[in-house]
């Protein structure tokens, strides 16, 4: 899926294949992207995958925390609103894997700043939203 939707300025939601293993800049530069559901099969996500996206939330379904390409930046770094202020977004992970994400070297920073949440919290935070798998 390398570069599949890269730079798509109108994409707000996308359904990714359930067999996807590697997200390699598939959504980089998709600035209108508001939400994403990352399938259970994903093992790697590109650095800055969601840079400049208008992300409200991401649902990350893999039980094992995915690794990041190019470890300097994380996929969810540099998410800004239209005034270039850091956007407040949440990353929801499976409840039974939350502790593993929270202690993971790559994901723990999101937990420290309150961006990482259990998937069961999604319905409370977004009562009018439904996510697709």
What residue ranges belong to the model's regions?
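Surface-exposed repetitive/solenoidal architectures
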Residues: 28, 51, 73, 99-116, ...
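BRCT (BRCA1 C-terminal) domain core and associated BRCT-interaction motifs
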Residues: 72-82
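Structural signature of tandem-repeat unit edges
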Residues: 7-21, 31-44, 53-67, 84-97, ...
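Short acidic, gly/pro-rich beta-turn/loop elements at beta-sheet edges
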Residues: 24, 46, 101
